[in-house]
Amino acid sequence: MLRFSSPVSHFKRTVMEDTIIRGQAIKAGERVVMFYGSANRDEDVFENPDTFDITRDPNPHVAFGAGGPHLCLGMHVARVELAVMFKELLSRMPLVQPDGAIERMHSSFIAGIHSMPVKY
């Protein structure tokens, strides 16, 4: 689910050494931006990347970062919170369905939902 709709839209990083990525030269000290939505729907990594499939395995998404020193410290807590939230929500409202337009947050950093009408 986090691969399909990442809560963080992008992160900016500083290039540590001169490098070339897909023919594009990038010099040390330059800033680059990684867009999570693009990385999490990369056709080279995910078969049918625009298909919502919670059984996808393996699922090497980068919703919590790509590893190393920038990996999200709270990712394990976030996964537990999501599991508990969905278990409780679905046990109380098993037939919950969308009932109107989703209103997204207006943010250049966080990709959240402001409101989402549902019916059950």
Where are these regions (language model features)?
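Hydrophobic, well-ordered secondary-structure elements that form the walls
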Residues: 1, 26, 52, 68, ...
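Conserved cytochrome P450 K-helix E-x-x-R motif and the immediately C-terminal K′/meander segment
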Residues: 1-24
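Conserved cytochrome P450 K-helix/beta-meander segment immediately N-terminal to the heme-binding cysteine loop
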Residues: 35-59
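Short acidic/histidine-rich active-site segments
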Residues: 65
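Cytochrome P450 heme-binding "Cys pocket" and the immediately downstream C-terminal segment
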Residues: 77-105
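Short, basic/aromatic-enriched C-terminal tail that caps enzymatic domains
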Residues: 111-120
